[in-house]
C-alpha cells in the first residue's frame, strides 16, 4: 500500500507547485493563453505566449498586481474594433512595453519602458484594434519596431 502513496503524493506536489507558479505571477488562472508571433521588418520571428484580455473585466484588470512576467509572455488586449485607446499603469508593479496594433496586425506605435504604478495616460495616437504588453525594454532588445507585424488569430 505504501508504494502507491509515494507516486500519488508526487503528483499532488507537482500539481500544487504548478498552480502556485501560475498564481505567483498574479495573472488570474481563468485568462486564456494563446500563441502569438511578431515578425520584424528584417524577417526575424519572435514567439510569445499571450494572455488574452478580451472581456471588459480582463481588460480593466490587465497586468495589475502582476509581479513577474517571463520574457516569452505578454498580454494581448482585444478591443474588438479599431478606436483610440488610452492605457495606464495603475497598480502595475512592472515596467512594460505597450505595442499598439491596428486591425491588420501592424504595430503602429510602441510606448517603451512604462513607469510602474503611474496614472499618466498612455494613448495609442491612432485607431488600433489591440495592445500587446511585454516586459519593459524587450521590444528594443528584440529589435521590434513600429511597422512590424503581429501574427495572431485576431488579425486574420
What is each PLM-predicted segment?
Residues 25-156:
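Compact, glycine-rich, soluble single-domain proteins
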Residues 1-4:
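Positively charged n-region of N-terminal signal peptides that target proteins for export
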Residues 8-19:
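Bacterial N-terminal signal peptides
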Residues 21-23:
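Sec/Tat signal peptide C-region and signal peptidase I cleavage site
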